[in-house]
From Swiss-Prot:
GO terms for molecular function: DNA binding; DNA-directed RNA polymerase activity; ribonucleoside binding. PROSITE patterns: RNA_POL_BETA (PS01166). It is an enzyme of class 2 (transferase). SUPFAM superfamilies: beta and beta-prime subunits of DNA dependent RNA-polymerase. This is DNA-directed RNA polymerase subunit beta. DNA-dependent RNA polymerase catalyzes the transcription of DNA into RNA using the four ribonucleoside triphosphates as substrates. Belongs to the RNA polymerase beta chain family. One of its GO terms (cellular component) is DNA-directed RNA polymerase complex. It comes from Pasteurella multocida (strain Pm70).
Length: 1342
C-alpha cells in the first residue's frame, strides 16, 4: 500500500484478514444528498422546491378568467455566514425569490384569448440552508433533522392473528396507504363479510365502494366469481364439469357419463378420479335437480315477455325458482362457483348485507359516514367521493406508492398514476379474497421493504407544500374579488404562511433536534439516526415488540446493536456503515456479485425487496487466490433471511465487509464479536457521551474506522487541494497549492482559519489545533488540523489507561473504580466546559432597564470585576454569586416608609426607583470569563464596552484580511518574479525595485507579456476584492443587531470551567463496562509491577464474567502488547541505535499475524522511519476490525515481540506494604472514556430555598434549588424507630409549617436552637379540598 507523507507519520497495524473491497462511504451522505435534492432545480419537477411549486401552481380563479403561473425560483445568498449566525443567534437561511406570471384572459373573446400578462419576482420567505456538515443553524443553535422510518405508501395485506374475535378466527384485512390523502381499508368480519373503512371511520360493506364506482350487482358477481353452468334439456339437469373444481369434495350423487360411473355417491373425490375424468374429456355430467338448490344465480334473469325480473342476481335458487326459470324459457342457468374450502362466497354474502342498491344510494351512504349530520345532495356526495381517491389535488400515492402497489398486486409496470383506478380497488379486493381463500401470504409490516426513509429534503418539501396550499387559498379568494387591473403578483402573495410553515418545521418539529455535540462521533451518529417516531410515525406507547425487534432485513441496513435503552428501544435506530437510500427511499446495502462460484469485483446495491430472491454468502467465507469459495458448503442467507448451507454454484452474492451489519458507533468497538449484545449496545451508546479531553490520545487498540469518523464528522480541517504548508499558527494554516491543481488566473493559495475555544451545544469546548508543520507536503483530503477528540486525524474519545483487574479494599465494589492520582496530575481526563450566560435589557412599562455599574445596595467588592459599563472583564475568575453584568430595572412607585424618605432626601431619586436585576454566576459554577459579546438594538446608543468590542473586531477583521492579502500577494509576486527572470531580467536588479514596479516591466516574448499583464490584472483584482471584503465586514460589525421585540441590549458572557476528574465522575470502557470513581488514590499506594510501574486504574474482575463482555479482556491484553512494543521502540531511540535496527524491529511488528495489510518500511526514507518511530514511542496503534479481529495466537505473538509474558498476567506488589500479591494479575491498557455525567453537575445541597405555592413545601430537583423528598416510606421508618421529635420536625418546620420555619430561622439567628411547630400547610390544603366538596370542616383546639 502507498502511504502519503501525512499517513506515514503514524501507521496503524491492521489485523484484518480480508482486504477492503469497498471504502467506508462518506458518512453524512444521507443528510447532504437529501437536502441537495430539495434545493437544486429539478428539470422534471419530480422533487424538491420545483415539485412543490408545480403541484400548487398555476392557481386559477374560480371563474377561470385569471391565473397565476409559476415560472422559476431562485435562492439568494445568505447575509451572514454560519459562524456569524451562531454568534448573533439568527437562522442561517437564504431568501427565496419566485418569478410568477399573472395572466388575465379576455372573457368577451374566444376562450384562451389573453388580455394581459404581468411577470414579477416575488419574495417568498427564507429557506434555512444546510451547513457543510449536514446541520442547520436555527436561532443560533445547531440542529439536526433526523430521518424518519415510516410505513411506505402502497397496499398492505395483514391479519389480526386471531386476536380480535373470541373464537380465535383469523380476520384478514387490506389497507391502501397513499403518500397524502385518505386511507382505504378492507377487512373481513367474523361472519366472513367484507367491509370497507375510509380513514379508519365506521365500516361499510365493501360492495358500497363498488356500487359507488357504478358497478351493478351482476357486474360485481362477474368480477369476483367463476361460473357453474347448468343446462335444462329433456327434463334433465346437466352441469358443465370442470374436474379440478371437485377436488376434495364428497360426491352427493353418482358421477357418471356414458354409462361409466367415475365416482360413487358418498365417496371423496381424489386426484385419481379427476385424472380419469380429464382423460375421458368429460365436460358435462347429469346432476339431480336438488343439486342446484341453494346455488346462487350469477345474473338477473328477466321474463322476456313481461320484462319482469324472474330471478335477480345473487338470489339463491329454489325448486320453485327453477320451475319459473324453465317456464320463462331459459335453457341455461349460470350460478356462482363457491365451496367451503378455497372459493368462499364472501362478496355474494356481503351484497346481502349491503343497504344500497344503486350508485346514488351508495354515494349517499358514504357521504353520511364521512360527514354525519349534513344533509346529502347528489352533487355533494359525488364531489366528496371523487375527491377522496380520484383527485390528484387531494390524493397522491407517489411514485413509491404506485411501485409498491403494482408489485403487491403482481403488475409488472412500476410506474403509473398517483390516484386510484377502479381496477386498483378491485385488484386489492381480489387479492384479499385470495388470501382469505388460503392462496397468498399476508405482508410483514416490519420488513424493510415495507418501511421507507423520509429524510430532510422530503420533509421540508412537504412542509413547504403545506405553506403553499395556504397561500393558494388566499390567492384564489383575492382573484375572485375582481378588479385585477392594478394588481401585481406581489400584491397577491403573502409570504407569511410559507415562512411560518418552514420555520415551524425547522424550529419545533419532533424530528428537528438539538444536535448532540458531545464529540465527533455523537455528531455523526445523530445525523445518521433513523427514528420511527415523529409526525406520521409511531408513538412510544402504541409500539409493540414486533416493531422494535431486530428483523432479518435489518442486515446491512440498520444496526441491530445501537439503539437507546428505555422507552425508545428499537424505535430509534442507526444506519449501518455501508447502507444508503435508493431513489424510492428504501435502504440498500452493497454486495459483491458472485458468478459460477467465483466472486467478482462488481458491487451491487440491493434493497430488502430485491434481496429476498438471492442466496448471499457472509463476508468471512473462505476464498482462494482466484476468489473462489474453498468450502464445499458455505453458510449463507437464503430466502426470507434464513441461514443455511449452500453449494458455491448456488450463491448469487457475497457481503462486502464484516463491518457491514453494524453502525459507525458499534464498528468502533474492538473485539465486538466477543461481547454480549446488551453490553455492546451500552458501549455503542456510551461512546457518544464521552467528553473531549484536554489532550486527545489515540486508542492503542482501535478498529481502523476511526479515521473515517474523524474526517467525515467535519470537526477536523481537511485540505481542499494538495500543496505545501507555507504558514502555520494556532489560528490559521496557509497552503501553497500544487501547480497542477491551481485554476489558471488565481493566486494558488488556500487559507484555512481554525475554530478556537468555542462552545458546543453540550457546553463542551470546540478547539482546532494544527497537526502539520511548516514546509510539509500535503495531499488533497488530508487532515491539516485536529478538532476536539481527534488525534492526527483519528477519532480519540478517551485515554489509554494502564488497568489491573483485581479487588482493592472494597474500592471497586459494584463497578466502582479506583483511580491513581497520577491520572489527575497528568491532566489525562481534564476537560474544559464553556457556559454561555446572557443578560437581556428590556423596555418595560415603567421605563427601560439599564446595564450599568451603578447598582443599588451592592458593595464595592462585588463590583470589582466589572468595567465602567457594568460588564465583567475578560480573564476575570468568577465564582457562584458574582455579578457578571450589572443591570437595574425600574420599579413601580410604592408608599414610602419614613426611612426611605430620609434616604431619598439624602441621596436623591436614584436610590429608590430601581431594583437590582443583575446577571450573576449560578450557584454551583465557577470559572474564567473568556469572551463577552454585546448586541445593541438598531437605533440604541452603544455603550463604551460595545464600542471597544466593535473596534477590536474591526481591527481583527482588518488584520486577518491584510494578512490574507499579503499571503496572496506574496504568492502572486513569486510567480511574477520567476516570469521576469525567465524573460531575461536580472534577479539582483529586480530585488532592488519595488515589487509593484515589476508589473510595469515589459517582456519581448508576447506570450510572457500576456502572462505578465494577466498577473497585473489579478493584482488589481486582489486589491479591489480586499477593499470589498473589508467594507462588507465593517458593515456587518457596525450595523445594529436584529433583536427580539422589546429587547434593547443583550450581553453574552462565556465562562470556561476546567474540570479535573474526581470521585463520583462516571467513566466507561468501550464494551459497556461503566462505573463511578470511588477514590483517587495516591500513586505510591497503587499496585505496581516488578519495574516499579504503578497501574492507573484498578477494575473489579467480577464485572466481567456475568456481563459476558470478554472483549475488554482481549483489548487489555492487546493494549499491553502495543504498549510493550512502544516501550521497546522508545528504549531503542533512547540508546540511539541505528535506523536499520529500528526499521527491522518495526517491520517485524507490522508483519506479525495474517493481516491483509502490508507495510513495507524499506520504501521509507531514514527520516520517515525516525518520525514514525517517534510517533510509536507511546505504543504501536493497532486495528482489529469488527468480526475480523486479532486471533489469540496473534496477541501472544505481539506480547512475545514486546518482551512480555504471553499469559497477559503480571506479578504485582501492594503499594502500601510492598508485599507481592498472591497470584499474577491481568494488567494491560484499556481505552477509557470520561462520560458527560459529571458529579459537579449533579451534586447539589439546599439551604433555604423556594417553596411550592399551594402546599408550601420545598420544591424538588437541582434546577429549582430543591430538597430531597421525605416520603411516605421514610415517615414509616421514623415511626418504626419511634423517633417522635425527629418526625415532628420533618413534618412541620422542615416541610410546610410556614410560621414555624420563620420562627425557627429567627431562633437560630438569635442563638437559641428551639422550635415551635405549628399546623402544617397541608392540613389547610386538605381542609380547603373538603370544603370544595361542600362539607364545612373546622379544626378546634382543645
Amino acid at each position: 500500500m502507498v502511504y502519503s507523507y501525512t499517513e506515514k507519520k503514524r501507521i496503524r497495524k491492521d489485523f484484518g484478514k480480508r482486504p477492503q473491497v469497498l471504502n467506508v462511504p462518506y458518512l453524512l451522505t444521507i443528510q447532504l444528498d437529501s437536502f441537495d435534492k430539495f434545493i437544486q432545480r429539478d428539470p422534471e419537477g419530480q422533487q424538491g422546491l420545483e415539485a412543490a411549486f408545480r403541484s400548487v401552481f398555476p392557481i386559477v380563479s374560480n371563474n377561470g378568467n385569471t391565473e397565476l403561473q409559476y415560472v422559476s425560483y431562485q435562492l439568494g445568498e445568505p447575509v451572514f455566514d454560519v459562524r456569524e449566525c451562531q454568534i448573533r443567534g439568527t437562522t442561517y437561511a437564504a431568501p427565496l425569490r419566485v418569478k410568477l406570471r399573472l395572466v388575465s384572459y379576455d372573457k368577451d373573446a374566444a376562450p384562451g384569448t389573453i388580455k394581459d400578462i404581468k411577470e414579477q419576482e416575488v419574495y417568498m420567505g427564507e429557506i434555512p440552508l444546510m451547513t457543510d456538515n449536514g446541520t442547520f443553524v436555527i436561532n443560533g443553535t445547531e440542529r439536526v433533522i433526523v430521518s424518519q422510518l415510516h410505513r411506505s405508501p402502497g397496499v398492505f395485506f395483514d391479519s389480526d392473528k386471531g386476536k380480535t374475535h373470541s373464537s380465535g378466527k383469523v380476520l384478514y384485512n387490506a389497507r391502501i396507504i397513499p403518500y397524502r390523502g385518505s386511507w382505504l381499508d378492507f377487512e373481513f368480519d367474523p361472519k366472513d363479510n367484507l367491509y370497507a373503512r375510509i380513514d379508519r371511520r365506521r365500516k361499510l360493506p365493501a360492495t358500497i365502494i363498488l356500487r359507488a364506482l357504478n358497478y351493478t350487482t351482476e357486474q360485481i358477481l362477474d368480477i369476483f366469481f367463476d361460473k357453474v353452468v347448468f343446462e335444462i334439456s329433456n327434463n334433465k339437469l346437466l352441469m358443465t364439469l370442470v374436474p379440478e373444481r371437485l377436488r376434495g369434495e364428497t360426491a352427493t350423487f353418482d358421477i357418471e357419463a356414458n354409462g361409466k360411473v367415475y365416482v360413487e355417491r358418498g365417496r371423496r373425490i381424489t386426484a385419481r378420479h379427476i385424472r380419469a375424468l380429464e382423460k375421458d374429456q368429460i365436460t358435462q355430467v347429469e346432476v339431480p335437480t336438488e343439486y342446484i338448490v341453494g346455488k346462487v344465480a350469477a345474473k338477473d334473469y328477466v321474463d322476456l315477455e313481461s320484462g319482469e325480473i324472474v330471478c335477480p342476481a345473487n338470489m339463491e335458487i329454489s325448486l320453485e325458482m327453477l320451475a319459473k326459470l324453465a317456464q320463462a324459457g331459459y335453457k341455461t342457468i349460470e350460478t356462482l362457483f363457491t365451496n367451503d374450502l378455497d372459493y368462499g362466497p364472501y362478496i355474494s354474502e356481503t351484497l346481502r348485507v349491503d343497504p344500497s342498491n344503486d350508485r346514488l344510494s351508495a354515494l349517499v351512504e358514504i357521504y353520511r359516514m364521512m360527514r354525519p349530520g349534513e344533509p346529502p345532495t347528489k352533487e355533494a356526495a359525488e364531489g366528496l367521493f371523487d375527491n377522496l381517491f380520484f383527485s390528484s389535488d387531494r390524493y397522491d400515492l407517489s411514485a413509491v406508492g404506485r411501485m409498491k402497489f403494482n408489485r403487491s398486486l403482481g403488475i409488472d409496470e412500476e410506474t403509473g398514476s398517483g390516484i386510484l383506478s377502479n381496477d386498483d380497488i378491485i385488484g386489492v379486493m381480489k387479492k384479499l379474497i385470495e388470501i382469505r381463500n388460503g392462496r397468498g401470504e399476508v405482508d410483514d409490516i416490519d420488513h424493510l421493504g415495507n418501511r421507507r426513509i423520509r429524510s430532510v429534503g422530503e420533509m421540508a418539501e412537504n412542509q413547504f407544500r403545506i405553506g403553499l396550499v395556504r397561500v393558494e387559498r388566499a390567492v384564489k379568494e383575492r382573484l375572485s374579488l375582481g378588479d385585477l387591473d392594478a394588481v401585481t403578483p406581489q400584491d397577491l402573495i403573502n409570504a407569511k404562511p410559507i415562512s411560518a410553515a418552514v420555520k415551524e418545521f425547522f424550529g419545533s418539529s419532533q424530528l428537528s433536534q438539538f444536535m448532540d455535540q458531545n464529540n465527533p462521533l455523537s455528531e455523526v451518529t445523530h445525523k445518521r439516526r433513523i427514528s420511527a417516531l415523529g409526525p406520521g410515525g409511531l408513538t412510544r406507547e402504541r409500539a409493540g415488540f414486533e416493531v422494535r425487534d431486530v428483523h432479518a432485513t435489518h442486515y446491512g441496513r440498520v444496526c441491530p446493536i445501537e439503539t437507546p435503552e428505555g422507552p425508545n428501544i428499537g424505535l430509534i435506530n442507526s444506519l449501518s456503515v455501508y447502507a444508503r437510500t435508493n431513489d424510492y427511499g428504501f435502504l440498500e446495502t452493497p454486495y459483491r456479485k458472485v458468478v459460477n462460484g467465483q466472486v467478482t469485483e462488481e458491487i451491487e446495491y440491493l434493497s430488502a425487496i430485491e434481496e429476498g430472491k438471492y442466496v448471499i454468502a457472509q463476508a468471512n467465507s473462505n476464498l482462494d487466490e482466484e476468489l473462489r469459495f474453498t468450502d464445499a458448503f458455505v453458510t449463507c442467507r437464503g430466502e426470507h433471511g434464513e441461514s443455511g448451507l449452500y453449494r458455491p454454484d448456488e450463491i448469487h452474492y457475497m457481503d462486502v465487509s464484516t463491518q457491514q451489519v453494524v453502525s459507525v458507533a458499534a464498528a468502533l468497538i474492538p473485539f465486538l464479536e466477543h461481547d454480549d449484545a446488551n453490553r455492546a449496545l451500552m458501549g455503542a451508546n456510551m461512546q457518544r457521551q464521552a467528553v473531549p479531553t484536554l489532550r486527545a490520545d489515540k486508542p492503542l487498540v482501535g478498529t481502523g474506522i476511526e479515521k473515517a469518523v474523524a474526517v467525515d464528522s467535519g470537526v477536523t480541517v481537511i485540505a481542499k487541494r494538495g500543496g505545501m504548508v507555507q504558514y502555520v499558527d494556532a489560528s490559521r494554516i496557509v497552503v501553497k497549492v500544487n501547480e497542477d491543481e491551481t485554476i489558471p488566473g488565481e493566486a494558488g493559495i488556500d487559507i484555512y482559519n481554525l475554530v478556537k475555544y468555542t462552545r458546543s451545544n453540550q457546553n463542551t469546548c470546540i478547539n482546532q489545533i494544527p497537526c502539520v508543520s511548516l514546509g510539509e507536503p500535503i495531499g488533497r483530503g488530508e487532515v491539516l488540523a485536529d478538532g476536539p477528540s481527534t488525534d492526527l486525524g483519528e477519532l480519540a474519545l478517551g485515554q489509554n489507561m494502564r488497568v489491573a483487574f483485581m479487588p482493592w479494599n472494597g474500592y471497586n465494589f459494584e463497578d466502582s473504580m479506583l483511580v491513581s492520582e497520577r491520572v489527575v496530575q497528568e491532566d489525562r481526563f481534564t476537560t474544559i466546559h464553556i457556559q454561555e450566560l446572557s443578560c437581556v435589557a428590556r423596555d418595560t412599562k415603567l421605563g427601560s432597564e439599564e446595564i450599568t455599574a451603578d447598582i443599588p445596595n451592592v458593595g464595592e467588592a462585588a463590583l470589582s470585576k466589572l468595567d465602567e459599563s457594568g460588564i465583567v472583564y475578560i480573564g476575570a475568575e468568577v465564582k457562584g454569586g458574582d455579578i457578571l453584568v450589572g443591570k437595574v430595572t425600574p420599579k413601580g412607585e410604592t408608599q414610602l416608609t419614613p426611612e426611605e424618605k430620609l434616604l431619598r432626601a439624602i441621596f436623591g431619586e436614584k436610590a429608590s426607583d430601581v431594583k437590582d436585576s443583575s446577571l450573576r454566576v449560578p450557584n454551583s459554577v465557577s470559572g474564567t470569563v473568556i469572551d463577552v459579546q454585546v448586541f445593541t438594538r438598531d437605533g440604541v446608543e452603544k455603550d463604551k464596552r460595545a464600542l471597544e468590542i466593535e473596534e477590536m473586531q474591526l481591527k481583527q477583521a482588518k488584520k486577518d484580511l491584510v494578512e490574507e492579502l499579503e499571503i496572496l500577494e506574496a504568492g502572486l509576486f513569486t510567480r511574477v518574479r520567476s516570469l521576469l527572470i525567465a524573460g531575461g531580467f536580472d534577479a539582483k536588479n529586480l530585488d532592488k525595485l519595488d515589487r509593484t514596479k515589476w508589473l510595469e516591466q515589459s517582456l519581448s516574448d508576447e506570450a510572457q507579456q500576456n502572462q505578465l499583464e494577466q498577473l497585473a490584472e489579478q493584482y488589481e483584482e486582489l486589491r479591489k476584492e480586499f477593499e470589498r471584503k473589508l467594507e462588507v465586514q465593517r458593515g456587518k460589525i457596525i450595523q445594529g443587531d436584529d433583536l427580539a421585540p422589546g429587547v434593547l441590549k443583550v450581553v453574552k458572557v462565556y465562562l470556561a470551567v476546567k474540570r479535573q476528574i474526581q470521585p463520583g465522575d462516571k467513566m466507561a470502557g468501550r464494551h459497556g463496562n461503566k462505573g463511578v470513581i470511588s477514590k483517587i488514590n495516591p500513586v505510591e499506594d497503587m499496585p505496581y509491577d516488578e519495574n516499579g510501574q504503578p497501574v492507573d486504574i484498578v477494575l473489579n474482575p467480577l464485572g466481567v464474567p456475568s456481563r459476558m463482555n470478554i472483549g475488554q479482556i482481549l483489548e487489555t491484553h492487546l493494549g499491553l502488547a502495543a504498549k510493550g512494543i512502544g516501550d521497546k521502540i522508545n528504549a531503542m531511540i533512547k540508546q540511539q541505535q541505528d535506523v536499520a535496527k529500528l526499521r527491522e524491529y518495526m517491520q517485524k511488528a507490522y508483519d506479525l499475524g495474517h493481516g491483509s495489510q502490508k507495510v513495507d518500511l524499506s520504501t521509507f526514507s531514514d527520516e520517515e522511519v525516525m518520525r514514525l518511530a517517534q510517533n510509536l514511542r507511546k505504543g504501536l496503534p493497532l486495528a482489529t476490525p469488527v468480526f475480523d479481529g486479532a486471533h489469540e495466537s496473534e496477541i501472544k505473538g505481539l506480547l512475545e515481540l514486546g518482551g512480555l509474558p504471553t499469559s497477559g498476567q503480571i506479578t504485582l506488589f501492594d503499594g502500601r506494604t510492598g508485599e507481592k500479591f498472591e497470584r499474577p494479575v491481568t494488567v494491560g491498557y484499556m481505552y477509557m472514556l470520561k462520560l458527560n455525567h459529571l458529579v459537579d453537575d449533579k451534586m447539589h445541597a439546599r439551604s433555604t430555598g423556594s417553596y411550592s405555592l399551594v402546599t408550601q413545601q420545598p420544591l424538588g430537583g437541582k434546577a429549582q434549588f430543591g430538597g430531597q423528598r421525605f416520603g411516605e416510606m421514610e415517615v414509616w421508618a421514623l415511626e418504626a424507630y419511634g423517633a417522635a421529635y425527629t418526625l415532628q420536625e420533618m413534618l412541620t418546620v422542615k416541610s410546610d409549617d410556614v410560621n414555624g420555619r420563620t420562627k425557627m430561622y429567627k431562633n437560630i439567628v438569635g442563638g437559641t436552637h428551639q422550635m415551635d411547630p405549628g399546623t402544617p400547610e397541608s392540613f389547610n390544603v386538605i381542609m380547603k379540598e373538603i370544603r370544595s366538596l361542600g362539607i364545612n370542616i373546622d379544626l378546634d383546639e382543645d
